[in-house]
Structures are given as C-alpha cells and as structure tokens.
Amino acid sequence: MNFFLHKNTTILVLAPIIVVASITFGFWFKFEKNITGFFLIGETFKKSPFLDENKILIVKNEVGYDGQQFLSLAFDPLMNHEGTLESLDNPRYRAKRILLPLVSNFLSLGEYKLIPYVFVILNSIGILTIFFMFYIIQKNKQSYYLLTLAIPGIWIVLRISTAEIIANTLILTSYFFIQQKKVKASFLFLMLACLTKETMIIFTISYGLVFLIKKDFKKIFVLAFFFIPFYIWHIYLIYKFGLGRDFD
C-alpha cells in the first residue's frame, strides 16, 4: 500500500495518465470519436441551433441530461438566439451556472466546433487540479492521494459534462488560499465557484458568518466587493427574464 502514499512521487505522474486514458477511451471507443457523446444528448429536448443533428451522438430513449443544457448554453452564453432559449428547459435556472459554458465559449475563440472539446478538457483539468490541490493541502499527512481519483462522482460528471468538477475545484482553491491567509485570492475563487454553480453560495454564507462572529467587518466588505461580477450577471438575468421563480 506504500505505493499510494504521498511520499511516492510516481502518483503525480499516474494521475494525468489515468485522466487522459479515460478521456481517450471514451472518445475513441465508447463514442466513436464523437465528442458530443460526453454530453448525453437525448431525444426529447430540442437541440441547440448551433448543433448539426446529423453529426451529434443522440442517446436513444434518453430525455437529455444537464450536459446537453450546458452545451447549448456554451454555444450562446448570453442567450441571444431564440433557438438557444428553446433548447433550454429553464433558461433562467440554467444560466445561473454560466462560468463553465462562458469560459468554454471564450477559449474556443468563436469556433463552435471546438466548444465541446474545450468543455471536456476543462473538466479534465478540474479533476487533476482537485487531485493536486488535495496533494498540496495534505502533503504533510499520510494520505492515499491516488484514491482521490477513485471517487465515482468525478467520472460521472466527466461523462455527462456538468459543472460540479469545476465548482468543487474552485471551492478547494478558495479554501487553499484562505488557509494561506491570501484572502482576496480566496474570495475571487469563491465568487467564480458561485458563478459555476449557484449552490456554492452556501460557502459564501459560511465565510460571512465566520467573519461576522469574529466582527471582522472589513473582510465582509471585501467579500461583498469581490462578488460584483456575480451581482452583474444576476442583474442581467433579471433584465432578460424578469423577476420570478426558476421553475415557472
């Protein structure tokens, strides 16, 4: 079992190999070199107007999963195309998780064919980041780091292309920086996590409560300041969709 301990640097090489091998197997063999297989596109929901239905992998007898929704959003993050709105089961709710689709679109430089690839690559990088962050944070303890990759959830998320990997990566990074007393960096990654998945706001509340108990009002102010992009995005959603519940 010593092979799995942090002292064996071989695991730092094995982790990327495992992730790359998993993606390669899925792309080449399971999905027959069709990257859209990672998004679990079903038969029921309307497809993004930026997708050619003759060139995507549609899973029969499937409604369609979150990955399909994220991909539609990645093609048109501001949801300016009417077809994008029609392809989303609940645009207001889906758009609250904008960061991963937005970054995928940005890094693809407007090339729609590249967006699915970038999306999958970002989630893959997220898995490795979680592994290496855990290694850095726990490096002075005897931990079985390679077993981090044995968590089923990360591979499920990679398979269906949702935002949990990136959200948790950002939260872990925020935690790392707060431990290093780098408060501003921590708050930045915390804000990005909340733009990735809105339920991460629970960590923001936790931070705020700790600062409130300690009467550290300066940090509360700084935390609120770093969330300006978060406020702006939600103001945009109100402008576009009005006020109301997510599930109208």
Per-region residue spans from a language model:
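Start-transfer (signal-anchor) and selected internal transmembrane alpha helices
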Residues: M1-L51
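Membrane-lumen/periplasm interface segments of specific transmembrane helices
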Residues: S22-N34, I205-L209, I213-D248
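Extracytosolic helix-loop segments that constitute the early lumenal/periplasmic catalytic or substrate-binding loops
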Residues: T44-D89
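Loop-to-helix entry region of an early transmembrane alpha helix in multi-pass inner-membrane enzymes
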Residues: E86-R94, I98, L102, L109-T129
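Transmembrane-helix signature of polytopic, membrane-embedded enzymes
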Residues: Y112-Y117, F131-G153, T169
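Specific aromatic-rich, kink-prone transmembrane helix
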Residues: M133, V157, I166-A185
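Membrane-interface alpha helices of multi-pass inner-membrane proteins
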Residues: L172-F177, K184-F211, F226
